[in-house]
Amino acid sequence: MLAFIDWLAKLPIGCCWVCQQPLAIGEHGGFCQPCLRELPRLPPSCLRWRCQQPELAVGRYWFAALSWQPEVAALVHRFKFHGASELAAILAPLLAAQIQHCYRQRPQQWPDLLVAMPISHSRWFKRGYNQAALLARQLQPLLQLPFAPGLLRRLPQQAKQQHRSAASERWHNMANSMHCTRAVDGLTIALVDDVLTTGASVSAAAEALLRRGAKAVDAWTLAYSEPHQPRSAAY
């Protein structure tokens, strides 16, 4: 009987999203234990000061869970551009754990509401989903925070693909590019996105929320890419 249980525990129940090797019973969350340990996690510190143009940055805290390394780039690429929407449920717990760690020393500043970074209509129709909104929906039960879908809209004239823009262009492209659809007076809002790079999109979204009365806006992203890193090359 013990031999059978040991054999059963080694049966594959899926594959690791990083190395593609079969997972055994007892390994869960989409990653094998070695790959989970090797994920390039970031320290629980604010990234706003690392913004390329800090004088233009808007928002209170910017937090991310993972550094933009090849394995993370591959995961985000599959999630964002190759229809792997199921990755939201795999990746959200990593972000949730990091967020809880980040606020451990500042519990009084815990946000009131989750909001997703919007994408253009053309991007939505091409992908069939907004990856940031999928992450936010998964974070909702993990962090016990309400989620307001559709609160932010991207204005049509600003629908340029930001992931292919140079860092300096992103700030110009994103200026006044977001619209908050209702008042959020006095609320502290957590803005959820997949990748933080220059901070241009985050700042534009934060400005839109602050114009409608938000008390403060924090940015929560799955990954952080240095502005000089060639993100498109990873795709």
Regions found by a protein language model. Name each.
Residues 1-192, 197-235:
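Glycine-rich phosphate/pyrophosphate-handling loop used in enzymes and phosphotransfer proteins
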